Amino acid sequence: MRGFYIGRFQPYHNGHHSMVERISEEVDELVLGIGSADDSHTTHDPFTAGERIMMITKAVAEYDLTTYVVPLEDINRNAVWVSHVESMCPDFDVAYSNNPLVVRLFEEAGIEVRQSPMFDRDRLEGSEIRQRMIDDESWRDRVPASVVEVIEEIHGIKRLQHVSDSDSLERYAATGESLPESLDDLDD
């Protein structure tokens, strides 16, 4: 049996890894869909699809599970999203997701969906890990060692910190606020 599991994997973290381990007990093969594959170099989506493929491929190598990592661009049309996924991926028998919209879309398309409890969600959330990277706080214990290696290889922290600064500048420009004259002028 082949399963399907989608995520943005920004970055691939220990919560995703625990989910893949759980799924590996139920299926013979797994398709890992990289959502928002067309987005990168932003605070929300700092890593490219290729970089996420490297993270995932290296991390799941420890499991005795045939995996296919497939980048999936956003199409922003929920009514045809499952058809888009099916056209881009090997056939699969069951989808795994805890996202209510994804669950609904697959169920409406007649595809079995299995959900599982989130793994240490407070610590293992992509936005929290990215913020820790930006703030130069501890994050390495929240991702597999192979993912740390990929992020270091691509200078991912430096990129994320840089795009975070750019995003901040864009927010100031969009709101018409003036930038503070010094860091001392920023509110805590």
Swiss-Prot record:
Any one Pfam family match given in the protein's UniProt record, by short name: CTP_transf_like
Gene3D superfamilies reported in the protein's UniProt record: HUPs
SUPFAM superfamilies, per database record: Nucleotidylyl transferase (SSF52374)
Any GO BP annotation: NAD biosynthetic process
Pathway(s) it belongs to: Cofactor biosynthesis; NAD(+) biosynthesis; NAD(+) from nicotinamide D-ribonucleotide: step 1/1
Enzyme class: transferase
Stretches of the chain forming a coiled coil according to its record: none
Reaction(s) the record says it catalyses: beta-nicotinamide D-ribonucleotide + ATP + H(+) = diphosphate + NAD(+)
Keywords: ATP-binding, Cytoplasm, NAD, Nucleotide-binding, Nucleotidyltransferase, Pyridine nucleotide biosynthesis, Transferase
Chief subcellular location: cytoplasm
GO molecular function terms listed in the Swiss-Prot or TrEMBL record: ATP binding; nicotinamide-nucleotide adenylyltransferase activity
Region (Disordered): 166-188
EC number from the UniProt entry: 2.7.7.1
UniProt keyword annotation of Nucleotidyltransferase present: yes
Cellular compartments per GO CC: cytoplasm
Localisation: Cytoplasm
PANTHER family: BIFUNCTIONAL NMN ADENYLYLTRANSFERASE_NUDIX HYDROLASE, PHOSPHOPANTETHEINE ADENYLYLTRANSFERASE
Family: Belongs to the archaeal NMN adenylyltransferase family.
Protein name from the UniProt record: Nicotinamide-nucleotide adenylyltransferase
Organism: Haloarcula marismortui (strain ATCC 43049 / DSM 3752 / JCM 8966 / VKM B-1809)
Lineage: Archaea, Methanobacteriati, Methanobacteriota, Stenosarchaea group, Halobacteria
